[in-house]
Amino acid sequence: MRTILNEMFSCLNEGKEIYLPSKFWQQLNEKNIAQLEASGLHNLKRTLAKNYFTFIVGLRNDQFRHLAAEAGLRNWLELLTYFPKKEAETDLDRLQFYKLSVFTRLLWLLAERHDKHKLLNRIDEPKFGNPFPIHFRNRLISQDLANSVLELSSIMEATSLGFENKLTICELGAGYGRNAYVFMKAFPNCKYIVIDIPPALYVSQEYLARVLPERKIMRFHPFKNIGEVRDEFAAADVVFLLPHQAEQLKEKSVDLFVNISSLHEMTQAQIKQYFELINQLTRGYFYMKQWKSFTNNNDGITITEAGYPYDPAWKKLLSRTARAQPAFFEAVYKIAK
């Protein structure tokens, strides 16, 4: 692991300074690397995932209360029955584990309600990464699978994309790869490009290579010119790039660009740079899901939905409170070719 990470960091340092980790990410990177060294990739859904979009929350949390209100009384008997035994290796106490189970089931119910394409019926939560043992309606469930289906449902609602289309999808900051996994299952003919910095780029690369064995993976290469990997890139279904490498992609070649909850973790200059990159690469749609307001004390900025540097030529197709997270907004933009 260390050899690959060192190679990634070395290549990143040779690129543009604007893409180096913000102070926020420097701190988070240290935590993520420490967790990787202590617990490995095999346990990432109980460690690293909690740094991304798996929430361990109490009953008074606004998201918990929102999901509870959305569930309706008739579902509560089912929600509160057939709890699994807490595994000894789970670092949660019994009460925390039960709260997590109820919360995850509430989120799953919401995702089922908005899953018009029945993706949850045909996409399973991968066992790799050691997900929390939470079951509902005779199957293993997770927050990440539910959230990814909710996000994809919003995209399909706002756009004219079809599941059989031959698409190029690009995600900035893919976490461990939850969206890439779901989107690749939903769009059998798509190419998926992950743009990220280490250690996240390493984590998503290793995770997706394991859970998508049927797909051709182009792992990270420390290339200076994308022509060096032209043939491998053309043949690959999933590609892993550092940000400065992504600048070499063909302009207006991406049908759907995605970012989930990471733009606020950057400096203002970095946010502007990434919006320019999104505009440069995208010929279709941009989906974003972010905090409505977030103060990044490490880098000294506060950002709101209105504060992002949208290009005036972009057409807003959707902007609303995220269905599962009342503190977040989600938006879809049409980007001119």
Predicted segments with their positions:
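Conserved class I S-adenosyl-L-methionine
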Residues: 164-175
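Conserved Class I S-adenosyl-L-methionine-dependent methyltransferase catalytic core
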Residues: 27-164
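Conserved SAM-binding loop of SAM-dependent methyltransferases across substrates and taxa
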Residues: 176-187
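A conserved beta-strand element that flanks and buttresses the S-adenosyl-L-methionine
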Residues: 258
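A short, conserved alpha-helix within the catalytic core of class I
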Residues: 265-278
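Core SAM-dependent methyltransferase catalytic element
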Residues: 312-337
